[in-house]
Structure formats: structure tokens, C-alpha cells
Amino acid sequence: MSDDPKTEFRDRLESIRTGMLEVDGRFLPMSHNVIEGDPKLWFITARETPMARAAAQGARARYLICSDGKGLYADIDGVLAVSNDEAKLDEIWNIVASSWFEDGKRDPDLLLVSYTPGEAETWMTEGGALGFLYQIAKAQVSDDKPDLGTHTTLNLA
């Protein structure tokens, strides 16, 4: 684990592919894209979706991550925006995205959306499910409290 919580958060987030994006009180499953050196998360969506409408208005949104395998649980607050950055689209384009858009990256229904995180409440654990069970068992036979990782609020702006 990195000594810097922001670095550790980004490293773990990069290895996770999905989360739940809250738009107008409704949670939508989405695949995010993390680009090294870029503080934003990137999404590809269709133009007539709740996410597209929210991005067109520069709306605030929450993105929730829950990954036992990577030991990251996060509630991220941020702002959505529509982007016309073709180089960014080229960088994040993948086979999953191509499954949704018949005409590929030039599909008229495709919309690139950036998500600029502001603050994230995070919980980071080590050892996955086995680590959790070990900590609980250890607490039962000792006077120690279980060490279930770190809980922090990160300013990502």
C-alpha cells in the first residue's frame, strides 16, 4: 500500500472497471476510464441517456465504487461535463464501448463525458475476504480491535 492515500486510491481505482453513477437520484451502472496523470474519470455513453442530459448541464453527481477484490469502497462527489476531445476518446476506446456503438468512435449517438472528482470518502482494506476473516478471528482471541484498513476523506480537486 502506498504511503499517499490519493496515490493508493487512484491506483486501486485504475484496476476497477465499474461503479454506480448517481444522476438525478437514480444510480446507473457505468464503466469508468482512468488515464494516468489525468485527474478526471472518463465515460462513454449514448446521447439520450440521463447521464448525457446531466453532463450537458454540468451537473454534480456521485460515483460509488465497491470492490472486495481490490479492497476499495468509495463515495466520490464530482461534476459531469460533455467533452469533444477526440484524442481522449481514442485513448479510452475499447472493445466494450464498440459493442454499444455500431459506427464505432464516430457513431453520432456516442457522447464522451468527463467526471471531475471533488471529494471522495474512501475505505481501503488489505487482504480481501480472507484478510477480513483473519482480522475478525484475531479480535475474538485477543484484546485487539480488527484492523480493517483506512477510512479517509480525500480532496481530489
Model regions and ranges:
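Short, structured beta-strand-loop surface elements
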Residues: 51-119
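Short, low-complexity Ser/Thr-rich regulatory SLiMs
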Residues: 34-36, 124
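Short hydrophobic/aromatic beta-strand micro-patches
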Residues: 44-46
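Short active-site oxyanion
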Residues: 37-42
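A short, Trp-centered hydrophobic/proline-enriched beta-strand micro-motif
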Residues: 9-27, 61-65
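N-terminal leader/targeting segments and the immediate start of mature chains
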Residues: 1-18, 153, 157
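Conserved beta-strand in the GNAT
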Residues: 29-32
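C-terminal edge-of-domain segments
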Residues: 108-157
